[in-house]
Structures are given as C-alpha cells and as structure tokens.
Amino acid sequence: MKVYTRPFQKEVYDKVDGPSKEALIKYLESEGHTIVSKKEDYYADVVTEKDGITFFHEAERKAQWKEEWPTYWEEIRIPGRKRRLVEKYKDQLENLYFYVFNKHYNQAWKINGTQMVDAIIKEATGPTYRIPKGETFYHVPYQEAERVDIV
C-alpha cells in the first residue's frame, strides 16, 4: 500500500516532542540504557546503548488516551510516515522500538520494529475527524504490544 502522510504540523510537534522525548528518556534510563543521542535529525528520536548494543527509539503521543487503554480500541496506530524509520533501520529492526504515550506521559505501548510490516499499513477507519482522508497508519493489535509504565 502507498503510504499517505499529512503535511507536517509544527504546532503539534512543538507541543509534544519535548515531553515525549523526556518521558522516553526517563523510561529508557530506568531500564539501564545509556543515552547516546537525542538530537533532532529526522531519524530516531533517541539512540541508546545497553550491553554493548545500539537501540533506536521513536516516540508518539495519543492525546485521546487518558487513563486506562479502552479495549474497544483494538489497535495501536502508528503513522505510516514512520515507514522511513523502518526502511532506515531495516537491518536492525530488532533494535528499533516505537512508543505511543498516553496524554499524561505515564504509560506507553512499546512496539518492536520487527512488527512494523507493510501488510499492516492501512487507512484509518472509525471516527476520523482528526485524520485527513487517506492518511495511512501501521495498525498493531494492542495485545501484540508491551504496555510500560513511566515512573
């Protein structure tokens, strides 16, 4: 499927990028990772090292997710534009992780890069008043992701 992405929304990026990275770094450091880079370079948000292995991490926020994950949201949706990361790190997908944070940045879904396959890229369905027609997402069943707490 052709990946459709909406135009860049600087005001949204400016609002969520800093808090998303801060929450991600807090979680990663609590898991024993050393931060190698958090520089904005259009690739992974945060690069870490743990046990001599380099890892790549990308953060998103789902503002509509406030407290507990509603189980009627059967899928976690990661924008199709993130395919550029899957392509960039295609030889290291087992070391690539995507995180989708809730509104409060105290919980996240963690998804491994190996799960990000073209077969799960689809247009969003359901109430899509915030999503431009045709925008594509990776649709990952929430049962196939790991929920992590940020403390």
Give the ranges of each region predicted by the language model:
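Short His-Asn-centered micro-motif
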Residues: 38-40, 57-60, 101-102
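Acidic-basic catalytic patches of nuclease active cores, encompassing PD-(D/E)XK
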Residues: 1-42
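Conserved catalytic cores of phosphodiester-cleaving nucleases, focusing on short active-site segments
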Residues: 28, 46-67
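Mg2+/Mn2+-dependent nuclease catalytic core
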Residues: 62-89
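Short connector loops at helix/strand junctions that flank enzyme active sites
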Residues: 41-43, 52-56, 91-94
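Short acidic/glycine-enriched loop/turn segments that link adjacent beta-strands
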Residues: 40-44, 105-106
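Non-catalytic C-terminal interaction segments of nucleic acid-processing enzymes
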Residues: 8, 30, 91-151
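Short linear motifs in intrinsically disordered
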Residues: 33-38, 84-91
